UniProtKB/Swiss-Prot annotation:
Name of the protein in question: Cytosolic endo-beta-N-acetylglucosaminidase
GO MF, one annotated term: hydrolase activity
EC number: 3.2.1.96
Subcellular location: Cytoplasm, Cytosol
BRCT domain sequence ranges: 287-381
Reaction equation(s) it catalyzes: an N(4)-(oligosaccharide-(1->3)-[oligosaccharide-(1->6)]-beta-D-Man-(1->4)-beta-D-GlcNAc-(1->4)-alpha-D-GlcNAc)-L-asparaginyl-[protein] + H2O = an oligosaccharide-(1->3)-[oligosaccharide-(1->6)]-beta-D-Man-(1->4)-D-GlcNAc + N(4)-(N-acetyl-beta-D-glucosaminyl)-L-asparaginyl-[protein]
Gene from which this protein is expressed: ENGASE
SUPFAM superfamilies, per database record: TNF-like
Assigned GO CC terms: cytosol; extracellular space; lysosome
Annotated function: Endoglycosidase that releases N-glycans from glycoproteins by cleaving the beta-1,4-glycosidic bond in the N,N'-diacetylchitobiose core. Involved in the processing of free oligosaccharides in the cytosol.
Keywords tagged on the record: Cytoplasm, Glycosidase, Hydrolase
GO BP terms, alphabetized: N-glycan processing
Family, as annotated: Belongs to the glycosyl hydrolase 85 family.
């Protein structure tokens, strides 16, 4: 059917319905005192957003069907999926497409301290799980029970998604989660076996134009999908002609990636020698140094001994932090240590001032099983923490509900909004908390209860005799500037047993300032204690500028208590936010405690008065009708797209207000899912089948969730109304 457009001048009170019929029927435009209708040939209706009733509205009467490209959508459900490229032909044929926009990372790379370019030894994490692209390929998440999740980002400097496909494009959920924590993400370009030799002959032995075309495409792919570079792994022998162009290829690829991706990286895997022979060296030496010199780093194979580290450190010189010594957690081959002995390998690597590359951390999940995975995962990383320097958050606002990207239900304001298992790493939130080493104190993920998302943070332990308190801190490194800064902090807590024996309070730590003013007292740090400690003021009543935030600060909601605080600071660097657990009364005995931390927000109070943006231009496309689960129902899948200022939303909640065939009050909105970009594919919506001559309507809503998690009024949501009827 030919696409048509109709332009209507709308008055404020007008409501527009667009109805498309399948079969032969004359186009008609008519109106009555209630509605304006535009009727076309076709199948379904596209309703322009109710949020923009003024001005000119363009309505497109194009018939849409299910999305076709199997690369970007699951063939059974039409859900958007992440993908890889197989072979040189697919790589060179790749080009950006509107169908692959779901695969574009929506989260910019956050700043952290110390930055990646600091010279301290780093930690690279290389994910290798059963060939890759498992449940993590479903961009909008899946109903997976007991999935593999990674959430110890504070220990990691670089993340690599590895598979044995020629071009591994990291699933966007991993890039979103890593970027939120300030961790750059690399894809993998790999060639192996006889097919790999043929591929390398085609683009390396073929001359400068051939390898430049490959490097250009790899840089374009990283730029388009917004990840940060490549691990290059040539696992096959090369001819003299091919190996002669390998270093120029790496240099050109590195330059292309640096030009296309801010902070981009290219890392070479220890495999090929300068002669073209495939022989893993387990060190940096003169036979593989030429490739190290051509890019940003070397990932050393994992069958090394301490003498390899000594020679590597000497040869690397000032670039010692660019050498990542491989550690296979599965302990394959002759290795120093893997599994729960991985710390033995890291101890030697750090002894020589080198970076580490931890390969296949999924050992915890695959070897020990799904049961007690979170407990075993925390144990694994806890054994390594002495050798893994951590990082601090550098920007505000900071808001986290401590979701690990999975759950047994979805919670909102302490109430379970949707029951059932879910898995989506894009929905993972920051977990930057570290216990102080006084008393016994532990943190763990609680899936049974949450304030928002899928989990909360369980904090439990004992205050030992002779101590008044224990603390858990959130590490920050935020320069507040000399002009002054008003911090607003909101915490949500649920107390457990012995709740009358302890109290919970907040403390701010400032650093590196000759004069730090907290609004009432100027703190002058001494040489012995170059920091100030501040106790934020509890806000009993909402000042006008904070009323939206304090609307959520109440007592007793589903067993949770929310409190908001304010602190004026000037000329400071904000370094830590600590949760202090103190005795209610002095006691010579230890005091046990347990509580759930549901949410923590640190906001710039001065920025909260601004009105949030509005969701604009909400449209529907790629519609696919099927028979429903019963004779009275249809099943509808469609893609929603909208506009919203970049960086202004943490995510979007996509809701349905229900489908109805009679004029009735709309139902309560039901959550369909979360979107982390400005598009969402609703799959398998059960809607009523209209009777002959009857029309039904479905209303869909898009609610922006701000980085501050301040509420956004419904008048700024996106709204779309679909009106449909049986074909004539």
């Amino acid at each position: 059917m030919q696409s048509q457009s109709v332009m209507l001048e709308l008055r404020e009170q007008d409501e527009v319905w667009v109805r498309l019929y399948k079969g032969e029927r004359e186009n008609a435009v008519f109106s009555d005192e209630y509605d304006t209708y535009i009727t076309f040939s076709g199948h379904l209706i596209n309703f322009q957003p109710a949020a923009e009733p003024l001005g000119t509205t363009v309505l497109h009467a194009a018939v849409d069907t299910r999305p076709q490209p199997a690369r970007y959508f699951d063939t059974g459900t039409t859900e958007p999926v992440s993908f890889f490229l197989s072979g040189l032909e697919e790589l060179l044929a790749w080009h950006p497409s509107s169908d692959d926009e779901f695969n574009v990372c929506a989260v910019p790379l956050a700043q952290r301290q110390p930055p990646l370019h600091s010279r301290r030894p780093r930690t690279l994490l290389c994910h290798d799980m059963r060939g890759g692209y498992l449940e993590d390929r479903f961009i909008q998440g899946s109903a997976t029970r007991n999935p593999y999740v990674f959430y110890h980002w504070r220990y990691v400097d670089i993340f690599v998604y590895f598979s044995h496909h020629t071009v591994t494009i990291p699933p966007v959920c991993w890039t979103n989660a890593a970027h939120r924590n300030g961790v750059p993400v690399l894809g993998t370009f790999i060639t192996e076996w006889a097919d790999g030799e043929k591929l390398c002959e085609a683009f390396l032995a073929g001359g400068e134009d051939a390898y430049r075309a490959v490097s250009h495409q790899l840089a374009r792919i990283a730029q388009h999908y917004r990840f940060d570079g490549w691990l290059i792994n040539i696992e096959n022998a090369l001819s003299a002609a091919a190996v002669g162009n390998l270093s120029p290829f790496l240099r050109h690829l590195t330059a292309e990636v640096h030009g296309a991706v801010p902070g981009g990286l290219v890392i070479w895997y220890d495999s090929i020698l300068e002669s073209g022979t495939l022989r893993w060296q387990n060190e940096l030496n003169q036979q593989n140094r030429v490739f190290f010199d051509a890019c940003d780093g070397l990932f050393v194979n994992y069958n090394w001994k301490e003498e390899h580290l000594e020679r590597t450190r000497e040869l690397a010189g000032q670039r010692h932090a660019d050498v990542y010594i491989g550690v296979d957690v599965f302990a394959r081959g002759d290795v120093v240590g893997g599994g729960f002995d991985t710390n033995k390998s890291l101890s030697l690597i750090r002894k020589h001032g080198l970076s580490a590359a931890i390969f296949a951390p999924g050992w915890v999940y695959k070897h020990l099983g799904e049961e007690n995975f979170l407990l075993n995962e925390d144990k694994f990383w806890g054994l390594l923490e002495d050798y893994l320097p951590t990082h601090s958050i550098c920007t505000l606002p900071l808001a986290t509900s401590f979701s690990v990207g999975m759950g047994t239900g979805m919670f909102l304001a302490g109430k379970e909004e949707e029951a059932g298992p879910w898995y989506n790493l894009s929905a993972q939130e920051i977990q930057p908390l570290y216990p102080e080493r006084r008393g016994w104190l532990s943190t763990s993920c609680c899936l049974q209860d949450a304030w928002c998302g899928g989990s909360s943070l369980r904090v439990q332990g004992t205050i030992p005799p002779g101590e008044e308190r224990v603390a858990i801190r959130l590490s920050l490194w935020v320069d507040l500037g000399s002009s002054g800064f008003s911090l607003s902090i909101c915490g949500t807590l649920a107390s457990g047993p012995h709740r009358d024996d302890f109290t919970v309070a907040l403390e701010l730590t400032t650093w590196h300032s000759s004069r730090c003013h907290d609004g009432t007292v100027t703190v002058l740090p001494s040489e012995d204690e170059p920091h100030g400690r501040h106790h934020p003021h509890l806000l009993p009543a909402p000042p006008p500028a904070l009323s939206r935030m304090l609307a959520a600060c109440s007592h007793g909601a589903q067993g949770w208590t929310s409190r908001c605080y304010e602190q004026e600071l000037r000329g400071c660097s904000l370094r830590d936010l600590s949760l202090l657990v103190s005795r209610q009364q002095a006691s010579p005995q230890e005091t046990s405690f347990s509580c759930l931390l549901g949410e923590l927000r640190v906001l710039d109070a001065g920025s909260m008065a601004a009105s949030p943006p509005q969701v604009q231009s909400l449209t529907a496309s790629q519609l696919w009708w099927q028979d429903g689960p019963s004779a009275e129902q249809l099943s509808l899948s469609l893609t929603l797209r909208w506009a919203f200022p970049p960086g202004r939303a943490a995510c979007f909640r996509v809701l349905s207000q229900g489908a109805r065939c009679h004029r009735a009050q709309p139902a309560q909105p039901q959550l369909l899912g979360l979107a982390h970009g400005c598009q969402y594919r609703a799959v398998g919506l059960a809607v009523p089948r209209p009777a002959p001559g009857q029309s039904c309507q479905l209303e869909l809503l898009v609610e922006p969730v701000l980085p501050s998690e301040l509420p956004v009024g419904p008048e700024r949501w996106g709204r779309l109304l679909l009106v449909y009827s049986e074909p004539a």
